Amino acid sequence: LIKNTKKPQSLTYYLFLTQLKKTLPKNRFTVLCPLQCNSGITYGCQNNGTILIYRQEEWFKVVIHETFHSLCLDFNSMHLEEINQKFKRELINVNSDLNLFESYTEFWATLLHSVYCAYTFTKDKVDEKSFLLYLDFILHYEKIFSLFQCVKVLDYMGLTYRNLIQGDEISKSLRNLHYKEDTNVFAYYVIKCVLIYYKEEFLLWCDKNNGNTIFNFKKTNNSLFSFLEFLKHHFRKDGLIEDTEKSLSFFNSFIKRYTYPLRNVLTKTMRMTIIDVD
């Protein structure tokens, strides 16, 4: 299934399923870091791989994510300085390491986890129609949730999606002043949102560019720059911009309408997926 020259000889998983949740800090001056955003760790493309998962929250989705890194299915092993500079020069200049491979990996982790959930929810395992209905339902809500998480994280920093994509001096100043991260926030919550929002188009891109295995990123510079072109083409599309504004409006109305603890469940969580199975 996976044709890769850097498959590990062994892969060991350590699961410490703590009850610690990923949540926004109470103090808006706190820079988002692994405490709020991360649930696992690994080193990609190692001969003897090790994966550590340290939260129960989203644990299986995180297993998929970290396994992608370990099996070298993304492009974390490539030299990314040029593509990062090109991204900041031609698309959005933010104070971020970018790590675009994290967005690619999180997209596929979300998609494959959704497939797993849909299969689990389908009572008759050979009922393809029911499975596809569940999958369509799940992916629809993951798209909505990704939009919500994107605008919520930006709002926490005092930014909107338009502040990110516009090239006027005010927007540039706001980005330079307000956008800060100590982990892959931009990759997890912003770029991943774009990929999930345009998942059909991105799946076609993967099918065209990745060869025989659709999720195994073809590790060439041409593929890297093609990936960047995909992002450039979709980041500023009207449909995405309009839906981020609708999500922001819903976020603000939700805060006003509901009180603790219900309000905090949705407005504070830093989960990256909303659908799960016990």
Region annotations inferred by a language model:
Residues 125-278:
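Long, compositionally biased intrinsically disordered regions
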Residues 4, 19, 69, 73-77, ...:
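Short amphipathic alpha-helical interaction elements and helix-loop-helix interfaces
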Residues 52-61, 94-98, 102:
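Amphipathic alpha-helical protein-protein interaction segments
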Residues 61-74, 109:
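Active-site recognition of the HExxH zinc-binding catalytic motif
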Residues 26-46, 68, 72-94:
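Short, flexible helix-coil linker/hinge segments at the edges of structured domains or between repeats
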Residues 1-47, 53-57:
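Auxiliary, metal-adjacent structural segments of Zn-dependent hydrolase domains
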Residues 76-144:
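Post-HExxH zinc-binding segment in Zn-dependent metallohydrolases
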